[in-house]
Amino acid sequence: MQKISVASAALLLALSFQATAAEPKEEMTTSGIGITMLKEGSGASPKASDTVKVHYRGTLTDGKEFDSSYRRNEPATFPLNRVIPCWTEGVQKIKVGGKAKLVCPSNLAYGSRGVPGIPPNSTLIFEVELLDIAK
């Protein structure tokens, strides 16, 4: 009976270490963007001058969704240097095929002006899946 208990304890310990190691960690950029890699890509990373094709979901910190290409069932394509600074910097950290969570401080998003559906001075949270880079 004791052998089963020791084996069970060892298995639970191994599983808890594996679960802890598998949790993605948020990294902060020097500008203040929080980036968590949810899925590692295997392709190239874009440059600010590239046009990217992405699927994304944007929410406020309370979880309210303000935009989603998934909901529209159509990826978005845009020049990376023509979006909010958080995206220009953050999406460059993702490889094609990868997915990341970007936590964008308001000064790197829409700041004090806000936009319809996004109040002024809002921190924004995006899940961004990089599908392709058009050079």
Feature locations, PLM:
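Cross-family detector of peptidyl-prolyl cis-trans isomerase
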Residues: Q2-K135
